[in-house]
Amino acid sequence: MSSGLSLERACAVALGIVASASLVAAGPCDIYSSGGTPCVAAHSTTRALYSAYTGALYQVKRGSDGSTTDIAPLSAGGVADAAIQDSFCANTTCLITIIYDQSGRGNHLTQAPPGGFNGPESNGYDNLASAVGAPVTLNGKKAYGVFMSPGTGYRNNAASGTATGDKAEGMYAVLDGTHYNSACCFDYGNAEVSNTDTGNGHMEAIYYGDNTVWGSGAGSGPWIMADLENGLFSGLSSTNNAGDPSISYRFVTAVVKGEANQWSIRGANAASGSLSTYYSGARPSASGYNPMSKEGAIILGIGGDNSNGAQGTFYEGVMTSGYPSDATENSVQADIVAAKYAIASLTSGPALTVGSSISLQVTTAGYTTRYLAHDGSTVNTQVVSSSSTTALRQQASWTVRTGLANSACLSFESVDTPGSYIRHYNFALLLNANDGTKQFYEDATFCPQAGLNGQGNSIRSWSYPTRYFRHYENVLYVASNGGVQTFDATTSFNDDVSWVVSTGFA
């Protein structure tokens, strides 16, 4: 028996002891450490990734006064204390400003700066994520993931201990398998330190989505692939790997790892079952990927050059030193399954009944005779009463429908123009005919919550959860509480985004 085989068996036995002793006691990074490939970065807004970790998981900043607070686990190794966030963010909006590194290396993720591409915020920075866009439960306890709309990104260009050059590393992420698009590039992992494209092989990151510009897998996607810079790779070929399946899990575990002329993609349902290997073998046959030229920055939600058109949801993920064994990763997957990720409610406040006709009354002082209505494709507010014309009363009435993109939220169909729905486009609200596309469904899905000013409901965009129905100069937008658009002004924001829902005029 070779010494290498003995060591492998010893590690497998040790991992088995860790896993069988208590999945609750051993977090993912404890398991990686036992396997000889310790975490050098560990990020999660939902739970601690070490059994002994009690520090901050993430920081939120509220819109009302700009103050911040850290969210820690309920107990060592436990689930995030979502109640602290809910209390701190009550009656206002909150953004996730920092995702802390639990490894002790200080590899925290913060708002991504501009690079080859500018972000949509001031000075070319990317957007920060809403703190409430991705509620879940872990073992029945509420927590929040990181729901990332196009334009949202986090980064650390001065990371410590991450792989550079052709050095070995591993990584995993737990993602929402139903939240993706085809834009570049929803990534988590190793990237350039300059925010620019410095050539083939300068990245090694998990990618999730259905982009087909470079590589692809079986079916129509989405797929787990690796962003190695100037290519999303599903295997040896720079085009297609039929062994990389389309994913349909609500919660997905995505794994990428790489060492000298060897790399792998693995994946699983994060709520049940075990990991499958979608590719394991030599580096891509295209030039520049053997050896690799990794730079060691860390990105989330964007490409290495700050390409920021993608969308996705991140719950937890780590990066390791060294190439983890399949056995180690299998034990990590068992721990993720034991965390029992499950969906949580996306709505709150007064309930809206699917199939009912409603009208939405402005609550801003001086404008309370106005209701949400439309004039052709323009969604606006108009003065409406029971004595208004039939046409106007119909224009100010909306049929509540199950959310076109997410059945946990709602869509609003025009009473006087059946088949047409309120949707956002360039952050203006429009009335457009349902064209049956994924983009339209996402643009037309909204999640009501308790009104920010204490009255009625505020209606949050599902696809841009920092943004709410807001009347501004009597026209409707999806607006954020502060931002670069004129309609993002903070003045009277809570009132302008709060609506009293009543039985429809028609």
UniProtKB/Swiss-Prot annotation:
Glycan-bearing residues: N91
Inducing or repressing factors: Repressed by glucose.
Paired cysteines (S-S): C29-C39, C89-C94, C184-C185, C409-C447
Chain intervals for the UniProt region annotation (Catalytic): 27-343
Compartments where located: Secreted
pH dependence as annotated: Optimum pH is 5.5. Stable between pH 4.0 and 6.5.
Signal peptide annotation: 1-26
GO biological process, alphabetically ordered: arabinan catabolic process; arabinose metabolic process; L-arabinose metabolic process; pectin catabolic process; xylan catabolic process
Keywords: Carbohydrate metabolism, Disulfide bond, Glycoprotein, Glycosidase, Hydrolase, Polysaccharide degradation, Secreted, Signal, Xylan degradation
Major enzyme class: hydrolase
Dependence of activity on temperature: Optimum temperature is 60 degrees Celsius.
Residue numbers spanned by region ABD: 344-506
Binding site for substrate: D227, N230, G304, H424, N426, F427, D443, H471, E473, L476, D496
Record carries keyword Cytoplasm: no
Gene Ontology, cellular component aspect: extracellular region
Metabolic or biological pathway, per its Swiss-Prot or TrEMBL entry: Glycan metabolism; L-arabinan degradation
PANTHER family tied to this protein: ALPHA-L-ARABINOFURANOSIDASE B (PTHR39447:SF2)
Known role: Alpha-L-arabinofuranosidase involved in the degradation of arabinoxylan, a major component of plant hemicellulose. Able to hydrolyze 1,5-, 1,3- and 1,2-alpha-linkages not only in L-arabinofuranosyl oligosaccharides, but also in polysaccharides containing terminal non-reducing L-arabinofuranoses in side chains, like L-arabinan, arabinogalactan and arabinoxylan.
Similarity annotation: Belongs to the glycosyl hydrolase 54 family.
Name used for this protein in its record: Alpha-L-arabinofuranosidase B
Gene for this chain: abfB
